[in-house]
Amino acid sequence: NGFTFVEYYLSRGMHIDDFAPNLSFFFSNGIDPEYAVIGRVARRIWAKAIKEKYKGNDRSQKLKYHIQTSGRSLHAQEIDFNDIRTTLQALYAIYDNCNSLHTNAYDEAITTPTEASVRRAMAIQLIINKELGLAKNENPLQGAFIIEELTDLVEEAVLQEFNRLNERGGVLGAM
């Protein structure tokens, strides 16, 4: 969808550097390992396309994104364990250097979250950042073989999907 917006704005006569720095993206997270690199892949693809295809400046090449932990991964049975699932997804997002994060409440699988469950969801982020100290450290996963390999594999799969979409006329044509 991001490139669809880019093409639309360009067709209206705007220059890439006038709008691209203001774009931001929203991704859902999950528990599968591929979610550990979603931001890396998106940033790599975005930067390359903005630089090479659209001739955008450095600022336009910087992708900003928000992550929301996945409601799909929350279980209706034994909902008390959903905090663990959400914590793992939050760690993926933070290790992947997301710009902002929403952690789902453990009871969202069965109801509108209570005030107490929302407080617990917020506490997940606070504990990760303050007590674990991730906000003060560089990403320890950067350069790890599995992360680099996963990034390459996921990027390849995403680019193949982009090609399939383009063959069908882009996002709008595929709809």
Where would I find each of the regions flagged by the language model?
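Charged/polar positions within long, soluble alpha-helices
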Residues: 7-11, 51, 93, 129, ...
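Active-site or pore-adjacent capping/gating segments
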Residues: 88, 99-175
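Helix-rich catalytic cores of soluble enzyme domains
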Residues: 1-92, 105-122
